Amino acid sequence: MSVKLQICDSTLRDGNHAVAHQLGRADISAYARAAEEAGVDVLEVGHGNGLGASSIQVGIAAVSDAEMLRAAKAELRNSRLGVLSIPGFASVERDLKPALDCGVDEVRVGAHCTEADVTRQQITMLRSMGVRVKGLLLMSHMASAGKLVEQAGLMQEYGAEAVVLMDSAGAYTPEMVREKVGELVEKLDIAIGFHAHNNLGLSVINSITAVRAGASIVDVTARGFGAGAGNAPIELVAANLHVEQIEARIKLFDALDAADTAEERFVKHVPTNDGVTIASGIAGVFSGFAAPVRRASRRFGVDPREILLELGRRRVVAGQEDTIIEVAMALAAEAASADLTHAFVDHI
């Protein structure tokens, strides 16, 4: 490869989804030290939904944004401290500027894959301040390669130095990765990245496929710690980069040690694939919906897989969590109606 691959470790951001955003200061400090030793280029830290997202709607974090960022920054020397900012959750004055005061080195500004225009204010402002800024296209499986080129092109125009495709639902196949990443690499003048989820068991091969297609940024988490079925594990991505002799700063043994540190401290349950996470990948539904879907399933007595498939049919995206309850109630009502019909027929 002509450009050295950058590794963005999202363990302390995406991983927060897996523990209902309850990572503590000591956990953050310990893992930040391990990630620094492993040689990750960027350590992304924060609430699972990014800056300013701690709320009743999507989960209240155990630690404030500022406390998380300061705890991580104190342990970093060569790795950059990164944050996720989603307009609507994060605002410039309340969230972004205080985060920069905490030592944030780069910001990734995210939006749904067809709504890049909402990132304009934040990307242009950050770029004018001299901050490294990248764009994220969420739920990118939902858009064609052509649409992604158009939307990523807007982010490039606003000043983003890179655009990362987020497989928020774990719905990508290697062929989809080749097509979409390859198209962006060919058509844009900035770096392209890929953020995998493992709902279909393809996070590692999709990450390596992205690199082969020209991506120069890959996201990872320790033990795949993240929303739903988890992400591409840092230890497995590092191992595959080593085997394939792909150049990167990350150090294999230290990456393995970082994953061990995470499991010892806070990865209580290593992400696995089950009926719910697999259905989420098939339906193309945001991985972070797994836990609320399970809760709604128990509350209303309906199959969580049916909830996910209906959410997929409705093309529901992150931020529309209220729809989960609506769908569960509708399915429960349909089931009750069917039961009454059967009971009536049986008595005729």
UniProtKB/Swiss-Prot annotation:
Pfam families: DmpG_comm (PF07836), HMGL-like (PF00682). Substrate binds at residues 13-14, 168, 195. It catalyses: (S)-4-hydroxy-2-oxopentanoate = acetaldehyde + pyruvate. Residues 5-256 form the Pyruvate carboxyltransferase domain. CDD domains: DRE_TIM_HOA. GO terms for molecular function: 2-isopropylmalate synthase activity; 4-hydroxy-2-oxovalerate aldolase activity; manganese ion binding. Its EC number is 4.1.3.39. Keywords: Aromatic hydrocarbons catabolism, Lyase, Manganese, Metal-binding. The active site is at 17 (proton acceptor). Belongs to the 4-hydroxy-2-oxovalerate aldolase family. Signal peptide: none annotated. The keyword Manganese applies. SUPFAM superfamilies: Aldolase, post-HMGL domain-like. InterPro entries: 2-IPM_HCS-like (IPR050073), 4OH_2_O-val_aldolase (IPR017629), Aldolase_TIM (IPR013785), DmpG_comm (IPR012425), DRE_TIM_HOA (IPR035685), PYR_CT (IPR000891). One of its GO terms (biological process) is catabolic process. The record marks 13 as: Transition state stabilizer. It comes from Salinispora arenicola (strain CNS-205). HAMAP family: HOA (MF_01656). Mn(2+) binds at residues 14, 195, 197. The keyword Lyase applies. PANTHER family: 2-ISOPROPYLMALATE SYNTHASE 1, CHLOROPLASTIC-RELATED, HOMOCITRATE SYNTHASE-RELATED. This is 4-hydroxy-2-oxovalerate aldolase 2.
